[in-house]
Curated annotation (Swiss-Prot):
It is found in: Protein storage vacuole. It comes from Arabidopsis thaliana. Residues 41-236, 295-444 form the Cupin type-1 domain. The modification Phosphothreonine is found at T115, T408, T433. Its main location: other. It comes from the Eukaryota. This is 12S seed storage protein CRA1. The keyword Signal applies. Residues 1-24 form the signal peptide. GO terms for biological process: cellular response to abscisic acid stimulus; response to abscisic acid; seed maturation. SUPFAM superfamilies: RmlC-like cupins (SSF51182).
Length: 472
């Protein structure tokens, strides 16, 4: 009897553990059955706008079928001149792209020291007991950012942006909700360290909207005063209870943070030294505190594919930026001229989120059933998801078409349907002949006519693109 009881207890324990594991996998993986059975895709626009004093945050509905299938959410930050996006952190990994403008970015990585120190003493605006108090400011790393920069941010790392230029600073970000690092539900949750959001938490669909306040607001003023060793009045000011400026505020006067000079302003010796050592470390000296998290994709000289008459494509993966291995995301930047075509391809191991930064293009996407689920025009500011395995072709219809793709794998791989490195090139002629019921001569043309690997001209003989007419 005791043996039966022990066996039942053991089985019950296994059952509980299995259900817990299954629940965790369901939370971090696909939540709904057949949510990637997509029969139609659409070019998406923002569904909500959070307005602030010096800018706005535009949020896409992450419950849209194609974004839910991809396990991501998407947002666009528009920061006006002298606008400061107050520090916040998310429950998910984030990959951002600077679509327009320039500015400053700072991160606060837990456990890391303040490596930026002011060489001159700082005198605050207040004086204590008749004596002026002087000290040197110290803080963590501050970087210059510009158009084309791709920025990797790990979960829980507080981040802020400042626009020190004259035009708006536009940053688009993808949040990996399905990441193993997200221990909450599949909703993006910003945690604000400063400021308030009177419009509420629009990131969470279906939840009653209440004004979103910063973290300090939830603690008692006495607790804040004791923890920071400040007076009660200052502690209450940290809570921003009567501050309705939003999450992007306007800086009055100069913004005097410690920052390195711009690249063109650095001494020539420093730039030559960096050039001799290269831009990539050997991996031994890079720690979490000093890890490089930014790389620029707008330099054609560093492109992976470049044709002066057609355009260029640049990729960014964990081999270029090692921190991407940790957040398991990567990026691609494309810029093509009118009538240039990106040959049909599919992502072998990742979903892709395509955001148009400039121009227009005609895009076709085909699903696993061989059905065309999207055939339309996409233009600046629109977004479309391309799920794993779905084939896609892009053709520029404006003078220049530029886009950025965020991919849900640190080393995303593509396969092409046409071209010198395509799947058709790898097939024997006999397989093509019998598979498509065409002659050996036609099979040779199918296999060898396209010499390019990625980019080609979409214009050609009048017969291109027309159905083949059967002989009478």
């Amino acid at each position: 009897m005791a043996r039966v009881s022990s066996l039942l207890s053991f089985c019950l324990t296994l059952l509980i553990l299995f259900h817990g594991y299954a629940a965790q996998q369901g939370q971090q993986g696909q939540q709904f059955p057949n949510e990637c059975q997509l029969d139609q895709l659409n070019a998406l626009e923002p569904s909500h706008v959070l307005k602030s004093e010096a800018g706005r945050i535009e949020v896409w509905d992450h419950h849209a079928p194609q974004l839910r299938c991809s396990g991501v959410s998407f947002a666009r930050y528009i920061i006006e001149s002298k606008g400061l996006y107050l520090p916040s952190f998310f429950n998910t990994a984030k990959l951002s792209f600077v679509a327009k403008g320039r500015g400053l970015m700072g991160k606060v990585i837990p456990g890391c020291a303040e490596t930026f120190q002011d060489s001159s003493e700082f005198q605050p605006r207040f004086e204590g007991q008749g004596q002026s108090q002087r000290f040197r400011d110290m803080h963590q790393k501050v970087e210059h950012i510009r158009s084309g920069d791709t920025i990797a941010t790990t979960p829980g790392v507080a981040q802020w942006f400042y626009n020190d230029g004259q035009e708006p600073l536009v940053i688009v970000s993808v949040f990996d909700l399905a990441s193993h690092q997200n221990q909450l539900d599949r909703n993006p949750r910003p945690f604000y360290l400063a400021g308030n959001n009177p419009q509420g938490q629009v990131w969470l669909q279906g939840r009653e909207q209440q004004p979103q306040k910063n973290i300090f607001n939830g603690f008692g003023p006495e607790v804040i005063a004791q923890a920071l060793k400040i007076d009660l009045q200052t502690a209450q000011q940290l809570q921003n209870q009567d501050d309705n400026r939003g999450n992007i505020v306007r800086v009055q006067g100069p913004f005097g943070v410690i920052r390195p000079p711009l690249r063109g302003q650095r001494p020539q010796e420093e730039e030559e030294e960096e050039g001799r050592h290269g831009r990539h470390g050997n991996g031994l000296e890079e720690t979490i505190c000093s890890a490089r998290c930014t790389d620029n994709l707008d330099d054609p000289s560093r492109a992976d594919v470049y044709k002066p008459q057609l355009g260029y494509i640049s990729t960014l993966n964990s081999y270029d930026l090692p921190i991407l291995r940790f957040i398991r995301l990567s990026a691609l930047r494309g810029s093509i001229r009118q009538n240039a075509m990106v040959l049909p391809q599919w992502n072998a191991n990742a979903n892709a989120i395509l955001y148009v930064t400039d121009g227009e293009a005609q895009i076709q996407i085909v699903n696993d059933n061989g059905n065309r689920v999207f055939d339309g025009q996409v233009s600046q500011g629109q977004l479309i998801a391309v799920p794993q395995g779905f084939s896609v072709v892009k053709r520029a219809t404006s003078n220049r078409f530029q886009w950025v793709e965020f991919k849900t794998n640190a080393n995303a791989q593509i396969n092409t349907l046409a071209g010198r490195t395509s799947v058709l090139r790898g097939l024997p002629l006999e397989v093509i002949t019998n598979g498509f019921q065409i002659s050996p001569e036609e099979a040779r043309r199918v296999k060898f006519n396209t010499l390019e690997t990625t980019l080609t001209h979409s214009s050609g003989p009048a017969s291109y693109g027309r159905p083949r007419v059967a002989a009478a």
